[in-house]
Amino acid sequence: MRVLLIAGGVSPEHEVSLLSAEGVLRHIPFPTDLAVIAQDGRWLLGEKALTALEAKAAPEGEHPFPPPLSWERYDVVFPLLHGRFGEDGTVQGFLELLGKPYVGAGVAASALCMDKDLSKRVLAQAGVPVVPWVAVRKGEPPVVPFDPPFFVKPANTGSSVGISRVERFQDLEAALALAFRYDEKAVVEKALSPVRELEVGVLGNVFGEASPVGEVRYEAPFYDYETKYTPGRAELLIPAPLDPGTQETVQELALKAYKVLGVRGMARVDFFLAEGELYLNELNTIPGFTPTSMYPRLFEAGGVAYPELLRRLVELALT
């Protein structure tokens, strides 16, 4: 069994992807090669990829797409790319054309989960509770049917990139301008308060298994990029201090959403708990694997060690 790990990418989450790849390479129980997509879209292979990993940045690559790889050498490809042009079905589509098994969700599920607006529409139709939201496209006047505070987010980014908390309607225009730097579509979501943020991991194909539920606590106004990836900025409680009934409901809703959206392999499913009501926030089909990432820590708390988790993900790609 030989694995090709693809990391980096052209999205704003380039550095996070490299941090995740470092952890995976350290723990994966199979011979694994690394390919890095630089921020200019070109690829780095071999020692140059490892050098980029060590530097946690690859502004310029060497090989244009498609890279000169001997794809037949690899049994499974592990795309560890966060954000657009990696987590949104694009790389998955390329691997489908190659006929290579790969870790994680397929083309349609990846694209659907990446789009916060479309995924909420599907989940709401299926009876999964979601926070009130409205989509706004670049160039159209925003019509927000609820009062502030609310969050403005690019529809197709992760890691809290481009997100603003808006307290007054007069600040909406600036928040949308920031979101439109990253996407042509934004979502405006009602802010819940007081709120607890819960996360659960799912592992499996169609009928997944859920990890214990974790909780994220922090002092920042919201769970932004710096809070997520700076050690000590957030407290991760695993398991979350919840009554058994609430924990079971979180797990059941996560598994339902996983099936409804057609996800396979893995996902981290994020929830809000406000005034006793649960709301599904989003599914991340390529969750972080950094030292502070919740997904591997949740499964470790459930008795699945990091190397075993990676082994199962690779094996799921072949089934």
From Swiss-Prot:
InterPro entries: ATP-grasp, ATP_grasp_subdomain_1, D-Ala_lig_Van_CS, D_ala_D_ala, Dala_Dala_lig_C, Dala_Dala_lig_N, PreATP-grasp_dom_sf. Its EC number is 6.3.2.4. It is found in: Cytoplasm. Binds 2 magnesium or manganese ions per subunit. Gene3D superfamilies: 3.40.50.20, ATP-grasp fold, A domain (3.30.1490.20), ATP-grasp fold, B domain (3.30.470.20). The keyword Membrane does not apply. It catalyses: 2 D-alanine + ATP = D-alanyl-D-alanine + ADP + phosphate + H(+). Keywords: ATP-binding, Cell shape, Cell wall biogenesis/degradation, Cytoplasm, Ligase, Magnesium, Manganese, Metal-binding, Nucleotide-binding, Peptidoglycan synthesis. Mg(2+) 1 binds at residues 270, 282. It holds the Pfam family Dala_Dala_lig_N. ATP binds at residues 147-198. Its main location: cytoplasm. Mg(2+) 2 binds at residues 282, 284. One of its GO terms (cellular component) is cytosol. One of its GO terms (biological process) is regulation of cell shape. It comes from the Bacteria. Pathway: Cell wall biogenesis; peptidoglycan biosynthesis. GO terms for molecular function: ATP binding; D-alanine-D-alanine ligase activity; metal ion binding. Its cofactor is Mg(2+); Mn(2+). Residues 120-315 form the ATP-grasp domain. NCBIfam families: D_ala_D_alaTIGR, PRK01372.1, PRK01966.1-4. Belongs to the D-alanine--D-alanine ligase family. Cell wall formation. This is D-alanine--D-alanine ligase. It comes from Thermus thermophilus (strain ATCC 27634 / DSM 579 / HB8). The gene is ddl.
